[in-house]
């Protein structure tokens, strides 16, 4: 159900309710940090996702897992929200709810998500340069980066913000040269 229209339809009201609660309690960034960590954990640990979405695993066991995952650093409101998801049998949509919440948070804080692909791992200084460039291009107040390494681009970077793609990769430049040579003949 990951990424399906059905999943996002169910996740949306929960994410909106959660951001409403976060705004009331002035905890939008705290929830955002907790949900980013939880989302990373869900994506990196297929076992955790399997346990939470399994109909065979008892609800109390799921709650126990969530309590241990959030630990002492987790917010009480957020923990109660997760317990509600277990009770309502909506915990299977947790990943989609986290993604929707983070998208709403980006709208709320005028932050854009930039997906950056590079041939080599970017240094912190390079990430800061990319963030500044994306701010200039988009007019956003802040930039959230998702980075990945792809040796196939040969060099440079590709930045995707929403539906816009800024391709300054060597592969992209070679492709554009090839296209211009093809039309020049």
Curated annotation (Swiss-Prot):
Q: Where in the cell is it found?
A: Cellular thylakoid membrane
Q: Which domain of life is it from?
A: Bacteria
Q: InterPro entries, per this entry?
A: ATP_synth_OSCP/delta_N_sf, ATPase_OSCP/d_CS, ATPase_OSCP/dsu
The alphabetized UniProt keywords are: ATP synthesis, CF(1), Hydrogen ion transport, Ion transport, Membrane, Thylakoid, Transport
Family the entry assigns:
Belongs to the ATPase delta chain family.
Q: Which GO terms describe its biological process?
A: proton motive force-driven ATP synthesis
**GO CC annotation terms, alphabetical:** plasma membrane; plasma membrane-derived thylakoid membrane; proton-transporting ATP synthase complex
Q: How does it assemble?
A: F-type ATPases have 2 components, F(1) - the catalytic core - and F(0) - the membrane proton channel. F(1) has five subunits: alpha(3), beta(3), gamma(1), delta(1), epsilon(1). CF(0) has four main subunits: a(1), b(1), b'(1) and c(10-14). The alpha and beta chains form an alternating ring which encloses part of the gamma chain. F(1) is attached to F(0) by a central stalk formed by the gamma and epsilon chains, while a peripheral stalk is formed by the delta, b and b' chains.
**Stated role:** F(1)F(0) ATP synthase produces ATP from ADP in the presence of a proton or sodium gradient. F-type ATPases consist of two structural domains, F(1) containing the extramembraneous catalytic core and F(0) containing the membrane proton channel, linked together by a central stalk and a peripheral stalk. During catalysis, ATP synthesis in the catalytic domain of F(1) is coupled via a rotary mechanism of the central stalk subunits to proton translocation.
Q: Name one GO molecular function term.
A: proton-transporting ATP synthase activity, rotational mechanism
How this chain sits in the membrane, per its record, is: Peripheral membrane protein
What intrachain disulfides are recorded?
none
What is the protein name given in its UniProt record? ATP synthase subunit delta
Primary location class: membrane
